[in-house]
């Protein structure tokens, strides 16, 4: 994928500053356009990545019971307003035939999918679909909780509100006991 055009972003930020009545040449703002461009390069770094590659290496451990990585901190940018949202992801899967992934790979997939203009609902679904496709588990359950700045600093102005999304696949979809186990473990500190 082609690199992010930082100069084009910096030029656009300068235009925005002028449009809101600011002087982009004043002391506090003179370097802001390029700072924003470098920030966008970082927060949109997932655009240049294929998150599914994290499951290219699978281990045969003969573990066929629940695996849960919880409280994976993430941040993303709302594609509607280009303001951040952030929170935690909880990712569970039920291995099939003992096929397991390195635990850090679950967090890496969440990061790569999050680091692009995005919707929380899409992150949740995409992580679950990648895991089902590449890891081939009996089931996957992804729950994400996030605070959205588009609800906190504008519009409805409701700081502290959380949005919770879930994607439930395979065995978790049809087994209430298994789903309840994941939810109980997420609540457990």
From Swiss-Prot:
Q: Which GO MF terms are attached to this record?
A: GTP binding; GTP cyclohydrolase I activity; zinc ion binding
Q: Which UniProt keywords apply?
A: GTP-binding, Hydrolase, Metal-binding, Nucleotide-binding, One-carbon metabolism, Zinc
- Its EC top class is hydrolase
Q: Which reaction does it catalyse?
A: GTP + H2O = 7,8-dihydroneopterin 3'-triphosphate + formate + H(+)
Q: Where are the transmembrane segments?
A: none
Q: Name one GO cellular component term.
A: cytoplasm
Q: Name one Pfam family in it.
A: GTP_cyclohydroI
Q: Give EC number(s), comma-separated.
A: 3.5.4.16
Fetch the Gene3D superfamilies from UniProt: 1.10.286.10, 3.30.1130.10
Binding positions (Zn(2+))? 78, 81, 150
- Pathway(s) of this molecule: Cofactor biosynthesis; 7,8-dihydroneopterin triphosphate biosynthesis; 7,8-dihydroneopterin triphosphate from GTP: step 1/1
Q: Which GO terms describe its biological process?
A: one-carbon metabolic process; tetrahydrobiopterin biosynthetic process; tetrahydrofolate biosynthetic process
Which PANTHER family does this entry report, sorted A to Z? GTP CYCLOHYDROLASE 1, GTP CYCLOHYDROLASE I
Question: Record's family?
Answer: Belongs to the GTP cyclohydrolase I family.
Assembly and binders: Toroid-shaped homodecamer, composed of two pentamers of five dimers.
- HAMAP family membership: FolE
Q: State what protein this is by name.
A: GTP cyclohydrolase 1
Q: Which organism is it from?
A: Listeria welshimeri serovar 6b (strain ATCC 35897 / DSM 20650 / CCUG 15529 / CIP 8149 / NCTC 11857 / SLCC 5334 / V8)
């Amino acid at each position: 994928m082609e690199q992010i055009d930082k100069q084009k972003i910096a030029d656009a930020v300068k235009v925005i500053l002028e449009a809101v009545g600011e002087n982009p040449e004043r002391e506090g703002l003179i370097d802001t356009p390029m700072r924003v461009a470098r920030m966008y390069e970082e927060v949109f770094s997932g655009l240049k990545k294929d998150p599914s590659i994290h499951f290219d290496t699978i281990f045969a451990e003969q573990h066929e019971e629940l695996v849960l990585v919880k409280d994976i901190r993430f941040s993303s940018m709302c594609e509607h307003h280009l303001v951040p949202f952030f929170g935690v992801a909880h990712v569970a899967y039920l291995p099939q035939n003992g096929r397991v992934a390195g635990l850090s790979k679950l967090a890496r997939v969440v990061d790569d999918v999050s680091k692009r203009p995005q919707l929380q609902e899409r992150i949740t679904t995409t992580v679950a679909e990648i895991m089902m496709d590449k890891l081939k588990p009996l089931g996957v359950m992804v729950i994400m909780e996030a605070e959205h700045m588009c609800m906190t600093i504008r519009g409805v102005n409701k700081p502290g509100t959380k949005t919770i999304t879930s994607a439930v696949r395979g065995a978790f979809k049809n087994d209430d006991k298994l789903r309840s186990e994941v939810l109980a473990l997420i609540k457990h500190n």
